[in-house]
């Protein structure tokens, strides 16, 4: 009988400690499964830990595997883990010796198939819609005729060629292309950066700021177009201050930026058609509108012309309109001439009456000069009035000719001319009256001078004026001979006398006889 302790100590089976075996298993797993892709459903995910790491499990219908995403890796993930999401995890398998459990350290995550992508897409769509990024009120109309168009797409391929060709065919404008990758790693970041870059351009800068943006890509699978479902791209589209057209994929392909953009085009070519109108159509439309406008203007002019002719027929003739103003003007002109002549004649007669009483030779020359000045003033006034009348008549004749086309203005001008002629007549009368007053004043002054120089004032002081038989004044005693008949003129009358011899006694005084009345002389008062 063999004892339990009688074992063969020389057995070839190696002996390991627990730590040694756990370490050996760890190294074996890490070497054998250094880089693996595992497909499974995320289970037990509660979001990142306070440390920043994420812990959850991957499972299928028969097994379960623990998984971890370190903090640095989690920040770089394009796809965030979500509970129940089916994913393909890429990483390495390792164990934790302290608990003899193996797990996968994930380096990247991607959806497992179209179903998972669609589920993720719907979830993201609901989230962004709840924030109002897809609201119709946020969408802006596209400019009718942009000067600059910005295009965000790949610089190579058929998309950019189709857009440029279509714009050149319809309405050539300035196109600025921002080259980006439209698929693969970094595509979404480049598209979002391009949209923000176009919005950052300043008006009048070296690179013109676009009036409208086109984000375009050709068709492809859901995975190919996934970059345009990225949240950063959608937010950049929603925040764009420039109206944006999304043209990603074909008409049946929808991405999240289609909901956030201002307009969605079924194809890149359709986006170019939305961005610019057809120049030929615009020219035809302008020509049509111009023709319609010209026709409408012609019709309106014809209508106005017929209406004007009808109104003209209803108006009286030009001669009828001008008959009364002409007659009034002729009467005023004739009355003005007659009035001036009568006034001048009256003033002349009055002047002659006054001048007839001015006998002294001292004033004769002055009066004759004043009369000449007066006649010159009268003639000058008459010539001035005649010239005024001639000018007014010439103006009225010119107004008469012009008023054949402008009746209303001619009638007003004739009235104004009549008023002006009447005013000139009044001014002429006033000037004549003022001149006569001035001449009367001058004559009165001359009369006063004449009175002051008259010899009668000397006789009033007791002197006598001796005249010979011929009536001439005797100025010297030597001119008197004895027996000469003399006439002595005193202030109150005349006395006859005979001259005696020098030294003879004076004759006896004659008998007093009744004084005869004083004969008034021809020298009367001036007025």
UniProtKB/Swiss-Prot annotation:
Keyword line: Cytoplasm, Exonuclease, Hydrolase, Nuclease
Mind telling me which PANTHER family this protein's record contains?
A: EXODEOXYRIBONUCLEASE 7 LARGE SUBUNIT (PTHR30008:SF0)
Give the superkingdom in one word. Answer: Bacteria
- Provide the reaction this enzyme catalyses: Exonucleolytic cleavage in either 5'- to 3'- or 3'- to 5'-direction to yield nucleoside 5'-phosphates
Region Disordered: list its residue ranges.
Answer: 499-527
Signal peptide (from-to) = none
The cross-references to Pfam families, in alphabetical order and at most eight, read: Exonuc_VII_L, tRNA_anti_2
Enzyme Commission no: 3.1.11.6
Q: Does the keyword Transmembrane helix apply?
A: no
Q: State the similarity comment.
A: Belongs to the XseA family.
What name has this protein been given in UniProt?
Exodeoxyribonuclease 7 large subunit
Q: What is the lineage of its organism?
A: Bacteria, Pseudomonadati, Pseudomonadota, Alphaproteobacteria, Hyphomicrobiales
């Amino acid at each position: 009988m063999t004892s339990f302790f009688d074992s063969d100590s020389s057995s070839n089976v190696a002996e390991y400690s627990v730590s040694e075996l756990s370490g050996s298993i760890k190294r074996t797993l890490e070497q054998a499964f250094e880089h693996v892709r595992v497909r499974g459903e995320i289970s037990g995910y509660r979001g990142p830990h306070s440390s920043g790491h994420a812990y959850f499990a991957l499972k299928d219908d028969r097994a379960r595997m623990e998984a971890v995403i370190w903090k640095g890796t989690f920040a770089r993930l394009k796809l965030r883990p979500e509970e129940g999401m089916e994913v393909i995890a890429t990483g390495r398998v390792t164990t934790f010796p302290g608990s003899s459990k193996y797990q996968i350290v994930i380096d990247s995550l991607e959806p497992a198939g179209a179903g998972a992508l669609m589920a993720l897409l719907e979830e993201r769509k609901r989230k962004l819609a709840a924030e109002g990024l897809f609201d119709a009120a946020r969408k802006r109309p596209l400019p009718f005729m942009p000067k600059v168009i910005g295009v965000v797409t790949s610089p190579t391929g058929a998309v950019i060629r189709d857009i440029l060709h279509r714009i050149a065919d319809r309405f050539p404008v300035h196109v600025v292309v921002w080259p980006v990758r439209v698929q693969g790693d970094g595509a979404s970041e480049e598209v979002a950066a391009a949209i923000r870059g176009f919005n950052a351009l300043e008006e009048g800068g070296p690179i013109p700021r676009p009036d409208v943006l086109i984000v375009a890509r050709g068709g492809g699978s859901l995975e190919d177009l996934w970059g345009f479902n990225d949240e950063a791209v959608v937010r950049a589209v929603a925040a764009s201050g420039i109206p944006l057209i999304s043209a990603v994929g074909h008409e049946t392909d929808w991405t999240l930026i289609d909901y956030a953009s201002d307009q969605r085009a079924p194809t890149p070519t359709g986006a170019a058609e939305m961005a610019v109108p057809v120049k030929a159509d615009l020219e035809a439309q302008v020509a049509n509108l111009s023709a319609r406008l010209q026709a409408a203007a012609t019709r309106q002019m014809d209508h106005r012309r017929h209406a004007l002719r009808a109104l003209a027929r209803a108006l009286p003739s030009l001669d009828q309109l001008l008959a009364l103003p002409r007659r009034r003007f002729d009467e005023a002109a004739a009355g003005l001439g007659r009035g001036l002549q009568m006034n001048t004649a009256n003033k002349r007669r009055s002047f002659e009456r006054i001048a007839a009483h001015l006998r002294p030779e001292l004033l004769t020359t002055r009066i004759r000069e004043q009369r000449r000045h007066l006649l010159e003033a009268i003639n000058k006034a008459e010539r001035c009035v005649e010239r005024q009348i001639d000018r007014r008549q010439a103006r009225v004749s010119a107004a008469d000719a012009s008023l054949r086309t402008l009746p209303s203005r001619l009638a007003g001008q004739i009235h104004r001319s009549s008023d002006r002629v009447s005013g000139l007549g009044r001014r002429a009368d006033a000037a004549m009256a003022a001149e006569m007053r001035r001449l009367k004043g001058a004559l009165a002054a001359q009369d006063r001078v004449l009175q002051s120089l008259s010899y009668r004032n000397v006789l009033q002081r007791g002197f006598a004026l001796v005249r010979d038989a011929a009536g001439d004044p005797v100025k010297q005693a030597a001119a008197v001979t004895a027996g000469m008949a003399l006439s002595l003129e005193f202030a109150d009358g005349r006395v006859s006398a005979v001259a005696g011899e020098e030294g003879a006694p004076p004759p006896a005084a004659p008998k007093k006889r009744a004084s005869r009345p004083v004969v008034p002389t021809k020298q009367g008062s001036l007025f």
